[in-house]
Amino acid sequence: MWSDVVEYIKAHSCRWSFEPDEGEWGIHQLDDPPHNRLLGPVFARGPAAGVIAIDGEIQSQWGDIHRADMTFSVTKSYLAMVAGVAVAQGLITDIDQPVSDCLEQRGILSHGFEDAHNRPISWRHLLQFTSEWSGQCFGVPDQIDHYRNVSMQPSASTKRKGEKRPLKNPGTYWEYNDVRINQFSLALMRLFDRELPAVFAEHIMRPLGASDTWHWHGYENSYIESNGRQLQSVPGGGHWGGGMVMSAHDQLLLGQLMVNEGVHNGQQLLPEHWIEQMQTPCDIAPWYGFFTWLNTNHVVSPSLPEESYFAMGIGGQLIWHDPVRNIVAVMRWIDSDFTGDILGVAGGEVKG
């Protein structure tokens, strides 16, 4: 079983160079100057790799599943997990509460949420990419991702990426925007008053028994001062470098945590209701949950079950979760032009 999927992936792997190349790696080169440069580190990659498990048992694997590689926007799903830790600890009691109110109630300055447009923005708005947050985060303006198109959104803008777009009210417009997720990450770090990689390690990765090869990098300028300490904020992807570097095997553990509704070895690491909310369709963008792609109306893959959900990143990073059949498939460095075909072959395996 799954041999057809593995063979198809091997025949359609990412065509990027193995060493970082400004001409093809990342998204930053598509940005308008002066923001078309790296702010964080990038790392050489390995060949295509991946692993497929059912009920936590590995069914098939290929490549080096223990090599830690950049995950790009798959990082967003891990940032949503860290937000789940904040919910579990009572730091966030209402995801519909404005971020500014949540921070200020705890005596934390609500940097970036002070003005009339940004004050009503809630945690939910940020998690669903409907915030319309406006400003600069570590020197990069939200405008840089205005009119941005990503491959899995159902409709595409005909405007030029980075062209100034009239802002809507928070919660009324969906846009995939890496500046806004970085602002979310910064607000979450302020709430914990700890660097998020430390939170992720303590509450998720170590309890899962993950390796110590993963690392989550910030930017050269993403430090803030808090109570006399320097804390580095981390991004939700690799748009300007940085982000999560992790092995396919560790990603499998995280995927299994998701399909097991936040439970690992009898321990509830993330609230079950949080896992459910991550998979709940956004009212105005039903293909998206909390930093998670959904197969609502089979918009991502006609071949896979509708309850499937995904974490995705450029360079052919894809994690497919099927919570009904308890399937987790981690695919690294596939040719993104063939993502639909690869998922189609996987769908054939599910249907048997």
Q: Where in this protein do the model-derived segments appear?
A:
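N-terminal leader/targeting segments and the immediately adjacent pre-domain N-terminus
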Residues: M1-I65, F72, Q89-T93, R190, ...
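Active-site-adjacent helix/loop patches that line small-molecule binding or acyl-intermediate pockets
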Residues: F18-I27, D101-E104, G112-T213, H249-L252, ...
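Short active-site loop at a secondary-structure junction
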Residues: L38-V51, Q61-C102, R106, H117, ...
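Short, well-structured active-site flanking segments
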Residues: Q59-Q61, A86-R106, F192-G218, N265-E272
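Active-site-proximal binding-pocket segments
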Residues: F200-A201, M205-Q279
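Active-site Gly/Thr loop motif
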Residues: H217, S222-G238, G242, M246, ...
